A protein has these predicted regions:
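Conserved ABC nucleotide-binding domain
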Residues: 111-127
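The feature captures the beta-strand-to-loop junction immediately N-terminal to the Walker
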Residues: 36-38
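Hydrophobic anchor residue at the start of the ABC signature
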Residues: 139
């Protein structure tokens, strides 16, 4: 079972204005967690750090007891983490199936259908789907990657 942990992580966009200060916790794969807080409290920033998109100002992010802040965030992101972004990051001229196959060679149709997309919707470009349908495509893409951690 994989673990993703923060140890005394801090981050600030401007010097002296810390968004995250001394954050420590541990997540185990196979479990679901929620990060809650008001707007501007650092939830998205924390997910960016966990996903290897940014580096903490201090502290460590560990994946299976390996300090990924020292060993390579890009490798960690590519091999162990799947991110579902707020803006979905879909290729709008591609279909849901094509978008899902960008991360995996698995048969995307059952995953997309399990998330409620119809045969007709699978043939449309994602630009022609509703926001909720696009979100389901982004979720399907993360599930298809089979990463131990989805953020």
């Amino acid at each position: 079972m994989s673990t993703l942990a923060c140890k005394n992580v801090a981050y600030a966009y401007e010097k002296g204005k810390g968004i995250l200060t001394n954050i420590s916790f541990s997540f185990e794969s196979g479990k679901m967690y929620a990060i809650l807080g008001p707007s501007g409290s650092g939830k998205t920033t924390l997910l960016s750090l966990l996903g290897g998109l940014d580096t903490p100002a201090k502290g460590n992010i560990l994946f299976d007891d390996t300090d990924i802040t020292q060993t390579g965030l890009e490798e960690h992101r590519r091999n162990h983490i799947s991110l579902i972004f707020q803006n979905y990051n879909l290729i709008d001229y591609m279909t849901p199936i094509e978008n899902t196959k960008l991360v995996s060679k698995v048969d995307a149709v059952p995953i997309l259908q399990r998330l409620g997309l119809t045969e007709d919707e699978l043939r449309r470009t994602v630009l022609k789907l509703s926001g909720g349908q696009q979100q389901r495509v982004a979720i399907a893409r993360s599930l298809a990657s089979d990463a131990p951690v989805i953020l």
